[in-house]
Amino acid sequence: MPRIRLDNLFGDPFALASVSISLLAWLIAFVSAIISSIRDSFPPIYWWNLVYMFLCIVGIAYVMATATTHIYSTAVVGYVSAGFAFTTFAADGLLKKQSGSNEAAGAGFILLSIVNVVWIFYFGSSPQSRSRHYIDSFAMHKEQPSYLNPSQMSNHYNNRPDTTVSTQPPQMYTSAQLNGFETSSPYGAPPGPSGASGIGNSQVNLAGTSSNGEAPNEVSPPTEYPYKAKAIYAYEANPDDANEISFTKNEILEVSDVSGRWWQAKKATGETGIAPSNYLILL
């Protein structure tokens, strides 16, 4: 489950402003609705509009605080579009009533409608669009996967935690350490340079494996890849890291986990490895 980080919300001027304005507009409509219910008559259906918009505001704040906009953007657009219809309908009905409290509630719904339009535009825009790029450029902690060129992405991801395969140096043996192996073979290898070489290689291989023939630090790859991702840039794997995989632009990959900066991916050819998430976009 994604972690809630308030830095993602307070460090993003757009997120902070839109959520704050929507909360202020909701409070205006809510307080005015209470006053209208006491003094005049407030249509009961509009209470559902207030509850629905409150849930939308909380949900959008959660999405922005967890930096999962790229995952839930489609759902957010759908919910906010329905909320826009609700708030517009409520504003039209309340402004027709000759009452100060109803008109104040209608003003709150109008302000909510304006924020809804802005949210529909933002969450409905592609991450590669210029408008989305411009808005996100003011954020302090937001990752911008589609706005960096490939060279910037490569440098941005060079500081990832090293994996077991890439950090473990090859085990080297000197001739002094291998001395005497030609006389200790249980297989009866012939003495001499050829026999010593064969037994030495056998001992080196056995030294790096466990009793059941598997490497002690080897991590088995996942068997399920529930997500699909599309490469927005071509990527060439680091030759010094056997865990990475190369892929071409627009290539479709299967992904097992979408958390973190590096995703475990599988190509159509069956090749598996890790890929930088900023080069991929979920489908």
Curated annotation (Swiss-Prot):
It is a multi-pass membrane protein. One of its GO terms (cellular component) is plasma membrane. Residues 36-44, 96-103 are extracellular. PROSITE patterns: SH3 (PS50002). Keywords: Cell membrane, Membrane, SH3 domain, Stress response, Transmembrane, Transmembrane helix. Residues 224-283 form the SH3 domain. It is found in: Cell membrane. Pfam families: SH3_1. Plasma membrane osmosensor that activates the high osmolarity glycerol (HOG) MAPK signaling pathway in response to high osmolarity. This is High osmolarity signaling protein SHO1. It comes from Uncinocarpus reesii (strain UAMH 1704). The lineage of its organism: Eukaryota, Fungi, Dikarya, Ascomycota, Pezizomycotina.
